Amino acid sequence: MADTEPSPLFVFSTIAIIISTFVIFYFVQQSKKNTPVLKPDTFQKFPLIEKTRVSHNSSVYRFGLPKSTDRLGLPIGQHISIGATIGGKEVVRSYTPISTDDELGYFDLLIKTYENGNISKHVDSKKVGEYVEIRGPKGFFTYTPNMVKSFGMIAGGTGIAPMYQIITAILRNPADKTKISLIYANVTESDILLKSELDKWAEEHPDNFSVHYVLNEAPENWKGSVGFVTPEIIDSKLPKASDDSNLLLCGPPPMISAMKKAAVGLGFAKAKPVSKLGDQVFVF
């Protein structure tokens, strides 16, 4: 019997099937990567994989995700909740990671340990390899590139965390032209968290980012401001109130109360009891 060559239609169909199978396999594999891990209503256990002390009472805690290709799944500007049973009671506190979803396989939390802080002491007591229970995301602020022309930010202490996350997202995106002006208040110079990173950003992105430090107790030859954040400092260091400029606040309650009052005096809208996306003044 003479050999017969396969018909062109058969060859084409076979190639099409092979290509289709490969494409389907590729997208299935891709869908398994970069999987968001967080669940808003369910606490999940995440292992502590690294702890870095950044001041006498604050540390950056790095927690691992199930796979090295996983992402936390937290929109920029939102936060997570840490839960624990302490003294027979369920205690929950919210924190904003300083990492973004660009980091795969882990996320970082900046936490200050307070003497009476149940959750902060609970986290600080953990050793590498031990677990913390976390759920999320939560919050009413979700950052999108170029959502405003400029952000004025006022942070106190660990209130730098949500600001740091937003700044990171903006400066990493060449297409994002948002300008950021930050006032960061602390008690002493040693209390300034992430200072080297902030100073580096200010040096590398002078057209998009500036930072001004305020200390209650300043050393000699201090180049920042001394005392409290005043309306005069806000007026000179942050963008003026406008439709294209938002003011973001995060810090101790007494400070935030004073900042909201100062903002109104400078022409900003009065901050609402619960801030929502789109508010001219947003309190984390």
Swiss-Prot record:
Keyword Transmembrane appears in the UniProt entry: yes
SUPFAM superfamilies found in the cross-reference section: Ferredoxin reductase-like, C-terminal NADP-linked domain, Riboflavin synthase domain-like
Annotated GO biological process: protein histidyl modification to diphthamide; tRNA wobble base 5-methoxycarbonylmethyl-2-thiouridinylation
Matches recorded under InterPro entries: CBR-like (IPR001834), Cbr1-like_FAD-bd_dom (IPR008333), FAD-bd_FR_type (IPR017927), Flavoprot_Pyr_Nucl_cyt_Rdtase (IPR001709), FNR_nucleotide-bd (IPR039261), OxRdtase_FAD/NAD-bd (IPR001433), Riboflavin_synthase-like_b-brl (IPR017938)
Pathway: Protein modification; peptidyl-diphthamide biosynthesis
Subcellular location: Mitochondrion outer membrane
Gene3D superfamilies, per the entry: Nucleotide-binding domain of ferredoxin-NADP reductase (FNR) module, Translation factors
Regions annotated as coiled coil: none
Gene Ontology CC: one annotated term: endoplasmic reticulum
Similarity comment: Belongs to the flavoprotein pyridine nucleotide cytochrome reductase family.
Protein name: NADH-cytochrome b5 reductase 1
